[in-house]
Amino acid sequence: MVNYTLSGTALKAVFLHSDALYLSIISLLLVSFAIFFCFFSIMMTVYFTISHLQEVPRYIFFAHLLINDTIYITLGLVSFFSSAYLIYFPMPISYMIVTISSSAFKVSPYNLAVMSLERYLAICFPLRHSGWCTRQKTILTIVAVWIIGLLPNVVDFIILCFSVQSDYFSVYCLSVRSVFIKNDAQETLRFVVHSLGFSLVGLIIVFTYIKIMLVAIKLNSGKATASKAGKTVMLHAFQLLLCMMSFSYNLIEIYLRKYLYMLPMINFYFFMCLPRFISPLIYGLRDEVFFRYMKRIMLCKTPRTFPNSDST
């Protein structure tokens, strides 16, 4: 997880300069989270109410993406307020929070990669798609994605255990990643994993987009479907770019922190939370099926039978 520790000295400076500005940003953060959680709840209601959606691979992946982002944002808020208000947790709980949130951070781009591959199979191999992309295989893919996301944290934990005293896990600490960095190998591991992971995901998205658009150019029939799938993959690329914005957090804070005392908090909102707040908007509201049933739920209407649609 990207380090966003707000020191006690910086926090005091915030209050001395402007309590109103500080409270405004906190309020904006909480209101944004409330709106995001509202959309999340409506979309999950649609997903679990319409049984057919639970059999379609891309909707399963999308539901998983929403759940994963919600986990990440929630634990990120816990870590942020732990740092800002100096709230201490038992070491094992703090480490668990950091581990799950950092794994969720890695899982988001991996999920975008498999969503792009699913669209690639649907357009380029339509006859085999139903056999390759079953509900069971989709669930197994999600499990595999989480295993890949957790493996670096397992290695990190082993390195940590060899780098600290035996009583290290018996104390209370802030729930931030910097507390658990005790060896340069941990930072090296994190850099390598993020670099390779995001590069591979980027290559997969570019590859699937090119393949899908080539099909759209060659086909006279079904061109609209392939074009829609290409636009969907481009949305995944945009979501990946939003995820990568998190890496600019440390660079901006290093060079600009001395000029803006509110920078840690502003950085946390715009580069850690906001990209995931808008995820339901750039994908969920664009999907015709989700939009139709979300509107029915918000208007308190009973959903009708799900149409056999393959909108992207």
What are these regions (language model features)?
Residues 2-13, 153-197:
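Loop architecture of class A 7-transmembrane GPCRs
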Residues 2-4, 20-100, 109-117, 144, ...:
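Structural signature of the GPCR N-terminal helical module
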Residues 13-17, 82-97, 180-185, 249-277:
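Extracellular loop architecture of rhodopsin-family
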Residues 44, 49-57, 124-139, 206-233, ...:
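Intracellular signaling interfaces of 7-transmembrane GPCRs
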Residues 74-78, 151-154, 158, 195, ...:
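Hydrophobic alpha-helical segments of membrane proteins
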Residues 107-111, 129, 133-169:
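Fourth transmembrane helix
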Residues 172-181, 214-247:
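Intracellular effector-coupling site of seven-transmembrane GPCRs
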Residues 245-312:
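Seventh transmembrane helix
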